[in-house]
Structures are given as structure tokens and as C-alpha cells.
Amino acid sequence: DISDTKATRRFGELLGVVFDAEPIGELGGTDGALAAAGDEAWVALQIERKHNHPVENLLQYWPWLERSRRRLVLVHAIAPDARRRTGPRAELTCWVGSMMERVLPGRFAYCRVELGSDGEAAQVAAARAAVEALRQPLEGRSLLGGA
């Protein structure tokens, strides 16, 4: 079990960002962190430990994005000991992430990372690609990294 501080530092190193931005309203608060990644561009890290209703941690960003022209990559880190890493709630969270990507094209990317899983390395690589795409100039940039 890694602490939130260690997990935040580790993800910052993996993604090439520093999670030191002040929370924006209630975003990036106790369950996560924010990093500035450019002009009106942010990387958010949400660490999911309980996994009771993970979709709530995702949905909190939607109104924030709707009210502005901000761009965001959300890295949703699911702890190894989180309950129900698979199942209907996990599937709903992934579906809502995909829906937000469609409704907010070029402005939002959802990157789920299941810590300690066989797919973790590929998931981190996809998140890193999304962060790099976020840093590119707005014209000619795909937030989804060619996906």
C-alpha cells in the first residue's frame, strides 16, 4: 500500500509533470492532485482506494470543463487493494470516460491505470502519450494521441 504522496510523486515522474497546482475549487483536493501542463491545460490525478463509486471521481470534472475552454487529462489510478476493480461500476466509469472524450473532443482524455495489474505499463504509456499530446500547440494536436 503506497501513500498518496508517494503515488503522486511516482505518477509525476512517470508522466513528466509536477503535481503542485493548487486545487481548483474542489478539484484536485483530498483524493487527487493537479499539475499545470500548458495554457489552460491540466493533468489531474485521482487515486481510487475504496472504489465504491469511482464514476463520481470522474464526473466531478465534467461541469468544470463545460464552463471553460480548459483541457484536461485525467489519470484515474486504481489502487491494488481497491474493491471491485472489475465489474459493473468499473465498466460504467470507463464508459463515462469515453463519453466525456466524445462530448469534449480534443479537450479531455480519460486514462485509467490499474496499479499492480498486468496492464499497468501499457496504461501508464497511454497516459504519458495523452499528456504529451496535451502539451502540443492547439492546432494539429490530438488529445487522444492518435486514438
Model feature map: region roles:
Residues D1-G25, G146-A147:
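Acidic-basic catalytic patches of nuclease active cores, encompassing PD-(D/E)XK
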Residues S3-D4, H53-N57, Q123:
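Phosphate/oxyanion-binding active-site loops and adjacent basic polyanion-contact surfaces
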Residues L14, A37-G38, R67-R71, R102-G106:
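Alpha-helix C-cap/termination motif
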Residues P23-A37:
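Catalytic centers of nucleases
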Residues G32-L34, E40-H51, W64:
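Conserved catalytic cores of phosphodiester-cleaving nucleases, focusing on short active-site segments
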Residues V43-L45, V73-V75, C111:
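Hydrophobic/aromatic beta-strand patches that form the interior of the parallel beta-sheet core
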Residues K50-M99:
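Catalytic cores of nucleic-acid endonucleases
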Residues D81-G146:
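Domain-level recognition of nuclease-like catalytic cores that cleave nucleotide substrates
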